[in-house]
Amino acid sequence: MRILFFHGHTQTGPVFERKTVRLREHIQRAYPGSTFFFPTGPIAYKVSDRLDYLSEIQRERSDNFKDPDLIETHAWFRLFEDDPPRGLLESLDIAAEILRVEGPFDGVICFSQGSVVGSMMASLLEGPRRRQRFDEYAASFPGAVRYPKSYKNINHPPLKFGITYGAYMGTSPVFNAFYSEPLIETPFLHFMGEFDPVVPSEMVAAVDKAQIGGSRRRKVMHPGAHAIPVGDRYHEAVVDFIRSACETSPTYFDLPSDEVPLLSYNDTPEQTPFQTPLLTPSLSSAVSTTSIPSSEATILATRRLDQWEKSRSPRSNIRPRSTRRTVFSGRRSTSSSAESSAASQHSDHFEATRTPTSSTSTVQMIEPTVNKEPNLAVRVVEDDTIVSGSEYEGEGWQELLLSDLLNEMLRRHGRPGRFYFVPDGEGGRLENGMRLN
């Protein structure tokens, strides 16, 4: 198995190689002796070139920004330029040379901007019908991209498969010959993050409508952001897709529905990519289409999560004190008014009772309602399980247990609720829980 990897914007081949270690381990186990090739995009970036659209949180958190231009970053083409953007056609020529010198390759795995190059390359390898489409479209649309000369005499078979993470595509009319009439029929598996703040929703819809992968395309939504999802089940899904795509039978690929969430396609063959000038996503366009946390809120939430990570090593002990339990909702308080407020806030999950011998209320967790999933219930812990003098003591720690960033994500997707990190009172182990309204 020989696989070509295309990195994302402002990455490099070696960086992408480090980010795919676990994925490649799974592929190697399934296909011993597999080889992987990690080219670097031709456009050299200074980090200062990208500060205009990086969020404030990225600048705040990274020490590299103290001397940003010492970092080597590359891209396959420039963002926010006229169609075709500078570097894109050059990158396709570089890909063709790699196919000649290092090929043949069985498939391609791409992240973000690399998915534009990877899907276009797969399209150009699909035979004379694709070249004919370029000629026909150029006759009717003078500004269209022409069939690259570097692919006219290339001796490389069509790719057997393609894998993309956080994909987008060229949606300008100048690129139509790559995607339509015929569709790209190379089997593609697309991973999309449910909380991806980089690729806007209209770009995800464009990838759907372009039907990249034809009848054998597949899309997996993962509960993450603009990144390669972590977890063996996702890497095994890639292996299963490769195995399915490399078989001669054009059967549809299926993932275990109990482990990996799927999104079925309901589009029709006649649907084509959006006819808009948008080619590349940005944080600014994402903000215009999707409500995301403000920079200040994001920075605050990230600092709290950083605090929490530091507090875990070495981990302080949490001592169970009694069977009395109170709601732990982000602030330390054992007053009856605070408990009444918390109980009211979570009335569908908790009930409050008052014991005659105590001045404080006891709040007990009850079973979730029928419409709620049990694993989404908020954990309840004792307020006094925090050992005095430990790193966990004080309102600062209790406030950071409540991740503002995750709550913003929940609200953004129409699922208002609260996300908690809470101690379970057993050896200091921290667990998480979620409550949806």
UniProtKB/Swiss-Prot annotation:
<feature type="compositionally biased region" description="Low complexity">
    <location>
        <begin position="314"/>
        <end position="345"/>
    </location>
</feature>
<comment type="function">
    <text>Esterase; part of the inp gene cluster that mediates the biosynthesis of fellutamide B, a mycotoxin that acts as a proteasome inhibitor. In the first step of fellutabmide B biosynthesis inpC activates 3-hydroxydodecanoic acid to generate 3-hydroxydodecanoyl-AMP that is then loaded onto the T0 domain of inpB. The 3-hydroxydodecanoyl-S-phosphopantetheinyl-T0 is sequentially extended with L-Asn and L-Gln by the two CAT modules of inpB. The linear lipodipeptide from inpB is then transferred onto inpA for the addition of the third amino acid, L-Leu.</text>
</comment>
<dbReference type="Pfam" id="PF03959">
    <property type="entry name" value="FSH1"/>
</dbReference>
<feature type="active site" description="Charge relay system">
    <location>
        <position position="196"/>
    </location>
</feature>
<dbReference type="GO" id="GO:0016787">
    <property type="term" value="F:hydrolase activity"/>
</dbReference>
<comment type="pathway">
    <text>Secondary metabolite biosynthesis.</text>
</comment>
<dbReference type="GO" id="GO:0019748">
    <property type="term" value="P:secondary metabolic process"/>
</dbReference>
<comment type="similarity">
    <text>Belongs to the LovG family.</text>
</comment>
<dbReference type="GO" id="GO:0005737">
    <property type="term" value="C:cytoplasm"/>
</dbReference>
<dbReference type="InterPro" id="IPR005645">
    <property type="entry name" value="FSH-like_dom"/>
</dbReference>
<feature type="active site" description="Charge relay system">
    <location>
        <position position="112"/>
    </location>
</feature>
<feature type="active site" description="Charge relay system">
    <location>
        <position position="226"/>
    </location>
</feature>
<feature type="region of interest" description="Disordered">
    <location>
        <begin position="306"/>
        <end position="362"/>
    </location>
</feature>
<keyword id="KW-0378">Hydrolase</keyword>
<dbReference type="InterPro" id="IPR029058">
    <property type="entry name" value="AB_hydrolase_fold"/>
</dbReference>
<protein>
    <recommendedName>
        <fullName>Esterase inpF</fullName>
        <ecNumber>3.1.2.-</ecNumber>
    </recommendedName>
</protein>
<dbReference type="GO" id="GO:0005634">
    <property type="term" value="C:nucleus"/>
</dbReference>
<dbReference type="InterPro" id="IPR050593">
    <property type="entry name" value="LovG"/>
</dbReference>
